[in-house]
Amino acid sequence: MNQKNIYNSWIVRILVMVLLLSFGILLDYLINDIITNQGLFTVLFLFAGMIVIEYARGGSFHTAGFPLDTKTLQEMMLAVVLGMMPIVGLIIVLSFFDLAHISYCSTFPLSGLVPIIMYAIIEELIFRGMIFQACIDRFSFAPTALLFSTIFATAHISNPSFDALSMINTFLAGLLFSFARYHMRSLWLPIVLHISWNCTLFMTGMTLSGLEISESFMKINLSHDIPSPWLMSSYGIEGTAYCTLALIVMGIIISTIDVPPQRQARIFRMEYTISS
């Protein structure tokens, strides 16, 4: 390893990113009463830190996890579909069997989507960003994915109605996002997938990670006859066996996607330069 650049050290990258994360959270906390920023500074500090450190290592925003190539748009569109279809599909099936009744709200504040989007981005930048990549460089993908998915699941433990199946599914979601990041050499897929999933739950008024949605585009009134925890739970769809199956299927679909060769080439060139 080229020791002249301190940012080639995995531990230095982690320490710098943790410091930037702390600054971002502190700023968001201090000015939240003045400006409803919804985690804006945390996102900016994490994103800017990743880009600056990657350029300092000889990389670019491409190798930092934000490649712009022929696959990027397709990757984002797939993420949107993967995030929506399991939820929309379940609603359609439940409605067909008269187990769910849909009503539409006359007013829907679009501003409610802002924290949903921002917190999904923050979680992905923390759990699948540069800290995640630095640990992969040091310990390889499998142990890193297991560790970060465990932390990701544990971070949701204080959510209402969190139980064993919710824990398993949140852990599997962490593995899914981690695999998407590693397989595609990109953060686009996990970020957009996470946003799509959360926004779909929010807009349909369904329970999101145990949290009840008070204002949404529509309201789904669910029958008490829906088998639990197979198709629904007090934690929402994320606490069901259906969600477990959906996460596994999504992982299989993602594994079939071909990674653009230019992504691999950029990373290889940077790693070759670092090691030479």
PLM region descriptions:
Residues 48-52, 130-132, 174-184:
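Generic transmembrane alpha-helix motif of multi-pass integral membrane proteins
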Residues 102-162, 173:
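Function-critical hydrophobic alpha-helical transmembrane segments in multi-pass membrane proteins
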Residues 64, 124, 135, 156, ...:
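Divalent metal-coordination and catalytic microenvironments
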